[in-house]
């Protein structure tokens, strides 16, 4: 890693930490936390909007990486297992992109940065939900697109609660909740998620 790259990463980590707590914190504070001069932050990112875009790009890459990793949904999964895998896989990076979506919207950066982060996740959920409704695994009270949007909003709310410290979860509780929202009976949802926890390496959670 070059010195410039290492400096950029250090600035991003400081910004992620500080902006996540206070979206209005000064760039001078970010610079101080990263151990660089304020002009160095401007040199790398051009200003606050550029810094937020840098964070969003990094989060988008983390989401893409998670969705292509060993714990991600695979074609052979039944819809309920696929949705559980999806939630559990994204939970570790979800806290990051939830904060950044809020920042991007607050900065008025438009829909593109938000879609960069959520686009791959939305596409995955849309396919899972459509298949789940076709097979009778998920309810059909609302159209697939509406159910997918409801699941997204539900999970972002759970992530907000986790960031605020109102509850703690490693993604398993969130996976159960998502399955229930989709129409899976609570006891079955718990068994699906619990099975993944019990099977260990190579199982539902891809560990």
Short names for language-model regions:
Residues 1-33, 49-53:
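Basic, helix-initiating cap at the start of DNA-binding domains
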Residues 35-45:
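Short hydrophobic/aromatic patch on the recognition helix
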Residues 45, 49-59:
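Alpha-helical DNA-contacting segments of helix-turn-helix folds
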Residues 54, 61, 65-97, 109-113, ...:
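Hydrophobic alpha-helical connector segments
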Residues 64, 110-160:
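Amphipathic alpha-helical packing segments from all-alpha helical-bundle domains
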Residues 69, 102-111, 194-195:
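Short linear capping/connector segments at secondary-structure termini
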Residues 77-105, 115-130, 184-188:
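Helical hydrophobic small-molecule/effector-binding pocket
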Residues 127-134, 160, 164-207:
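C-terminal peripheral helix-coil segments that are non-catalytic and often amphipathic
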């Amino acid at each position: 890693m070059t010195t410039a790259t290492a400096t950029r990463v250090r600035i991003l980590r400081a910004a992620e930490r500080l902006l996540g707590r206070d979206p209005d914190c000064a760039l001078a504070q970010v610079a101080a936390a990263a151990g660089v001069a304020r002009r160095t932050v401007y040199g790398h990112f051009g200003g606050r909007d550029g810094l937020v875009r840098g964070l969003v790009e990094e989060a988008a890459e983390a989401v893409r990486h998670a969705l292509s990793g060993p714990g991600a949904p695979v074609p052979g999964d039944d819809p309920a297992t696929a949705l559980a895998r999806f939630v559990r896989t994204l939970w570790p990076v979800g806290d990051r992109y939830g904060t950044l979506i809020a920042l991007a919207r607050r900065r008025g950066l438009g829909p593109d940065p938000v879609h960069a982060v959520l686009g791959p996740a939305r596409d995955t959920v849309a396919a899972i939900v459509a298949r789940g409704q076709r097979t009778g695994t998920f309810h059909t009270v609302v159209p697939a697109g509406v159910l997918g949007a409801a699941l997204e909003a539900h999970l972002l709310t759970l992530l907000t609660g986790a960031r605020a410290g109102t509850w703690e979860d490693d993604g398993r509780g969130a996976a159960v909740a998502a399955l229930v929202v989709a129409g899976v009976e609570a006891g079955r949802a718990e068994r699906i998620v619990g099975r993944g926890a019990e099977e260990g390496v190579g199982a539902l959670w891809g560990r």
